[in-house]
Amino acid sequence: MRTEIVEIYSDATNAAVLRHPGRHFPGVLVQGDSLYALCRQADEACEAARGVLDEDAYDELNALRNALWSYLTHYKVVLGEHEIPLPFSEC
């Protein structure tokens, strides 16, 4: 872990906008529990869309779901490395 100064443009709950040093454009900070909820929602959307959407559309939806889960997996690994408990239950 390191500490750096970031520019905070908005600290809205679950949608903080900040710029990390070295980045040209700001990004959005999504809290871990919100990211987990988005992953679960994407799972449900894929389940509901299977057999309903055409193959290309389903593949795009599934790619979105996989990208979200990839972010969540990275988040969980980093928190684990720093012995920080997850802000959600995976039960």
Regions of interest found by a model, annotated:
Residues 46-91:
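Short, charged, surface-exposed hinge/linker loops at domain edges
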